[in-house]
């Protein structure tokens, strides 16, 4: 299995990171993509990708951190993207829900990262929350210059899913879909997503699936729970889990690993 979204640099993993990776492997999660959310975190994610076999990383600035973008940011990301472990630009995009950075700052950092990804011919790992129309408006001019993109941790509506997929993007599905309180709309639209546009991720340590039984003592999510997400998604889509695993693994490899060096 391939977890395309793991926040490896989170301090929640500081005391047992090696053991967490070992639990993932024991559960059948052999490949992982570590998310970079700032320049510093992207550098750390790349270092962890060097350390763990079968793992890669992204390099980017999350919309929450867009206020930190300056003239040096693109140069530092460009240098980092030259590392063999870095296979995508991101996490980048727009988040108008909390606006930790202003919308103008977010839009500038997003556009500059799209420009960089186009220059380097790298796919993009995207974030969008409460900003769908503006997100697409900024993304559209770059689509024919990018080798691919995934909208990570998709939690939008069916209409938003259709508009996103019409542009050729992949959708990343997390344990959000296992939440009986807020994930039912996403669960209902799962069959709308073509299998060749679907990717799976935990977004660990966040979004622990709420329907795990028995429920873990800790609320911290881990990549070892990706098989549970896969099983549930396959059930709600009416597909064989083994087939869906092979399909989503192939999707991840096609998007991220076309030109990657073996990890």
Swiss-Prot record:
Cofactor: Mg(2+)
Superkingdom, natural source: Bacteria
Principal cellular location given in the protein's record: cytoplasm
Documented EC number(s): 3.1.11.-, 3.1.13.-
Chain sites annotated for binding a divalent metal cation: 91, 127, 152
Any Pfam family: TatD_DNase
InterPro entries assigned: DNase_TatD-rel_CS, Exonuc_TatD, Metal_Hydrolase, TatD-like, TatD-type_Hydrolase
GO (cellular component) term, any one: cytoplasm
Keywords, ordered alphabetically: Cytoplasm, Exonuclease, Hydrolase, Magnesium, Metal-binding, Nuclease
Quaternary context: Monomer.
NCBIfam families: PRK10425.1
HAMAP family referenced in this protein's UniProt entry, alphabetically: TatD_exonuclease
Protein family (similarity comment): Belongs to the metallo-dependent hydrolases superfamily. TatD-type hydrolase family. TatD subfamily.
Primary role: 3'-5' exonuclease that prefers single-stranded DNA and RNA. May play a role in the H(2)O(2)-induced DNA damage repair.
Protein name: 3'-5' ssDNA/RNA exonuclease TatD
Source organism per UniProt: Cronobacter sakazakii (strain ATCC BAA-894) (Enterobacter sakazakii)
